[in-house]
Amino acid sequence: MKLLYIFEKNIILRKILITFSLIIIFLLGRYVPIPGVLISAYKGQDNNFATLYSTVTGGNLSQVGVFSLGIGPMMTTMILLRLFTIGKYSSGVSQKVQQFRQNVVMLVIAIIQGLAIAISFQYHNGFSLTKLLLATMILVTGAYIISWIGNLNAEYGFGGMTILVVVGMLVGQFNNIPLIFELFQDGYQLAIILFLLWTLVAMYLMITFERSEYRIPVMRTSIHNRLVDDAYMPIKVNASGGMAFMYVYTLLMFPQYIIILLRSIFPTNPDITSYNDYFSLSSIQGVVIYMILMLVLSVAFTFVNIDPTKISEAMRESGDFIPNYRPGKETQSYLSKICYLFGTFSGFFMAFLGGVPLLFALGNDDLRTVSSMTGIFMMITGMSFMILDEFQVIRIRKQYTSVFENEEN
């Protein structure tokens, strides 16, 4: 009874235990095999980028299982829905309608990705349409289960979907440790050391920019003492965080799923395979597109996380203002310039730090997996701060009690 009382009263302990339990379920599901599939003969194991993408999105294509799709379908859905609902179009749509749209789009995307992966399987007693559809259905179901687990964690635990992705990436990087030692023994000592040093520098810069902020002076009408001179609006230097990396991999991988399906339908058409170079990190075209997408998404996520329109409207309603800028459109324009400035800065810095190792490893299949390590750990660093910030909010909230609760005591 005492343990139950502690569990009910200690919100931090309760959230940690719930999150830990959901992580265990998530990790176990990654290794639940799909019936009828020859795991040892899975062709996708040779696709380094597909394996990397599955790791980034919480999946596992190195050893195919029920959760192999990860949260990839949900992330692709969020990107598409955001592209088609830019501005205030979705503001008047009910939550139920938005959820329905998201589920429908996610179902279509999950089927496309599931079919592309299931086609790469080898099956017991040969291939059949029934086995293909069954494997696809299981993969799609696994994607929805992961989405459900992430939503449960967001409501009852902490870290939401982000902590599942971080755990998946950490597990994937631990699996790469034997490969790093093997490359070190095969004569790649200098390359491995340079990659590790570059990754450490990138993580240090990521932490520095993550905790740096630009302070915009704000005149708050509700403050009438000496604190009015100290009021400011903090703008993070790296407002996009580590999310841009994850969405870049999503945008690069989804066309590859389409190409896999088209290649299975038109196996004699050589032009289909040639398009794959534009979305693969093993080609110069793919790396350049990767760096461009990193820049674009960094700017986009800066606007999403700061939202100059919403901030300017809130300031106008409260009577607050930025010195030398009129409330409304002028304030919004000023904040938009700040977003462009820092979004472009963080985009260039992340594209450079994440892209240089990929360029260095071009043409070398052995170093390709290790070269992506910098981007992965930058992503882990950025997402870890998001989780820590949420934990800090919960901890601070726990220090305050309800007024009515104090009166009862």
UniProtKB/Swiss-Prot annotation:
Pfam families per record: SecY
Keyword Zinc-finger belongs to the record: no
Q: What's the protein's topology in the membrane? A: Multi-pass membrane protein
The alphabetized UniProt keywords are: Cell membrane, Membrane, Protein transport, Translocation, Transmembrane, Transmembrane helix, Transport
Q: What broad class describes the main subcellular location of this protein?
A: membrane
Highest taxon in the source lineage: Bacteria
Q: Which Gene3D superfamilies match?
A: SecY subunit domain
Localization = Cell membrane
Q: TM segments?
A: 16-36, 61-81, 104-124, 132-152, 161-181, 190-210, 242-262, 286-306, 341-361, 374-394
GO BP annotations, alphabetical order: intracellular protein transmembrane transport; protein targeting
Name a single GO cellular component: plasma membrane
Subunit description? Component of the accessory SecA2/SecY2 protein translocase complex required to export cell wall proteins. May form heterotrimers with SecE and SecG subunits.
Q: Tell me, what does this protein do in biology?
A: Part of the accessory SecA2/SecY2 system specifically required for export of possible cell wall proteins. The central subunit of a protein translocation channel.
Q: Which family does it belong to?
A: Belongs to the SecY/SEC61-alpha family. SecY2 subfamily.
- Recorded protein name is Accessory Sec system protein translocase subunit SecY2
Q: Which gene encodes it?
A: secY2
